[in-house]
Regions:
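Short, intrinsically disordered, charge-balanced linker/junction segments flanking boundaries
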Residues: 149, 408, 426-429
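Acidic, low-complexity/disordered segments
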Residues: 1-23, 27-29, 120-122, 131, ...
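Short beta-strand/loop turn elements enriched in aromatics
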Residues: 35-62, 258-294
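Short beta-strands within extracellular/lumenal beta-sheet-rich domains
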Residues: 368, 388-402
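Short structured motifs
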Residues: 52-55, 106, 312, 393-397
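Assembly/oligomerization scaffold segments
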Residues: 1-139, 176-182, 187-197, 202-204, ...
């Protein structure tokens, strides 16, 4: 949660509130266009962000936040290329003073103009990391990887080297395996966040920030603060991770002592390929320790809104159908300017951990088709020659076993070196 005063937290949960939004647009040339609540087309503004997909908790997320807004401003849209938009939320406290919460810095990607309205769509600085990466010989700690991406893409880091090195695997020396699918600096951040056991996002100051999933609630959302809500009847929790070792072409499995939850598949992480087996086990064990804090109830709720909430914040819900003994986490949110705030936490059911999804079944079917189309030819030659005389001698013997249905054909070839015994014959003509 963005640091705010206790007076702000009390005011934002009150039955009524007085607030307004403001912002400014800074062009690439340094020209500043300020706007306030009256310049915003009612119902047009929104901010949406996420740290997971639409179905399950993820490690290594590097999602970009999106902002859209329509303004009654007379600005030439062609001057807004590479412009930045800053938004702020101002809430009146009980004392009568206003407290300001920055809502982020976004870079304009689209600017459309109608007769009276300027329509903007913008994304945060995460998109800057979509630049080609060619440092395949890179070696360093997680902070070194972050600093490399930060310098190359022009985005400041929110944390110091000491803060990153204090994290799980933060002080380990990492190296990029030559055989990898890294294309951009964003891919490097993805794999680095996996090793650290969390995700990256751009914070409200426009800096790259690493966050982990926690277990300490930052606030409670009461029933009177919710317009609608739905809660799952299960708790998402992870008790194992699996990682593919490219050198041995095997999937390595690491689990807690009681392994009865979901398994996080790390796939082929090029930063987890080098080192001894014990080193890989330690790295994956630290990732599992960070992941084991995930003990969340998936939910979806429309609330009166608290603009100070951030991705990764742990919440509790009470009242109605909510279980106040369980915790949950904000994995995505949408803030409507002048409207509601939608909060969501995704997660899979541990009871279905062994079940295959439709996509998994389709992939398995395709792999089976590929395997079915393979033709294998194996040639065997006897180690030594056989001498054949008047008695029967077995010269070909094949023992065959298959783990699946196959069509098999056997062909035998006997190369004979015949030596005839000379015999004297006579005949009369």
């Amino acid at each position: 949660m963005y640091p705010v005063s206790e007076a702000f937290l009390q005011a934002v949960q009150g039955n009524t509130r007085k607030y307004y939004w403001s912002g400014k647009i800074t062009t690439a040339g340094g020209v500043v266009h300020s706007f306030d609540q009256e310049d915003i087309v009612k119902g047009s503004g929104y901010i949406t962000a996420q740290c997971c997909g639409n179905s399950e908790i993820e490690l290594g997320a590097v999602y970009a936040a999106e902002m859209g807004i329509s303004l009654f401003l007379d600005i030439d849209r062609y001057t807004l290329e590479d412009a930045e938009v800053e938004l702020s939320y101002h809430l009146r406290l009980a004392s009568g003073a206003y407290e300001t919460v920055p809502m982020g810095i976004f870079e304009v990607s689209e600017a459309n103009r109608t007769v009276h309205v300027l329509e903007l769509k913008a994304y945060d600085r995460m998109l800057r990391f979509d630049r080609a990466f060619n440092g395949f010989e890179t070696i360093g700690t997680a902070y070194g990887m972050m600093a490399l991406c930060s310098t190359a893409c022009g985005v400041e880091l929110a944390q110091t080297q000491a803060e990153i090195e204090a994290l799980p695997n933060g002080s380990e020396l990492l190296s990029i395996y030559p055989e990898n699918d890294i294309e951009t600096y964003r891919d490097v951040l993805y794999f680095t966040a996996q090793v650290l056991g969390g995700f990256f996002c751009i914070n409200r100051a426009g800096k790259l920030e690493f966050r982990q999933y926690g277990e300490t609630p930052v606030m409670e959302i009461l029933q009177k603060h919710r317009f609608s809500s739905s809660f799952s009847d299960f708790v998402t929790r992870y008790t194992a991770v699996s990682s593919t070792n490219l050198r041995t072409q095997t999937s390595e499995y690491y689990a807690l002592e009681t392994d009865d939850g979901l398994t996080m598949n790390l796939g082929v992480n090029p930063l987890l390929q080098f080192g001894l087996e014990e080193t890989r086990a330690e790295l994956c064990g630290n990732i599992l320790d960070a992941l084991s804090k995930v003990n969340y109830v998936p939910f979806d709720s429309d609330t009166i809104g608290n603009p100070a909430l951030d991705l990764g914040d742990v919440l509790t819900f009470s009242g109605g159908q909510a279980d106040d003994q369980q915790i949950t986490c904000v994995t995505s949110f949408t803030v409507k300017i002048g409207g509601r705030q939608s909060l969501k936490c995704v997660g899979k059911n541990p009871r279905l951990s062994q079940a295959k999804s439709k996509s998994d079944k389709n992939i398995s079917g395709l792999l089976n088709q590929i395997e079915a189309g393979k033709i294998g030819i194996h040639t065997f030659t006897n180690a030594s020659e056989y001498s054949i005389g008047e008695t029967d001698v077995r010269i070909i013997s094949i023992e065959f076993a298959s783990k699946e249905e196959n069509h098999t054909q056997f062909f035998g070839q006997v190369v004979v070196d015949v030596a005839a015994d000379p015999a004297a014959r006579s005949a009369n003509a």
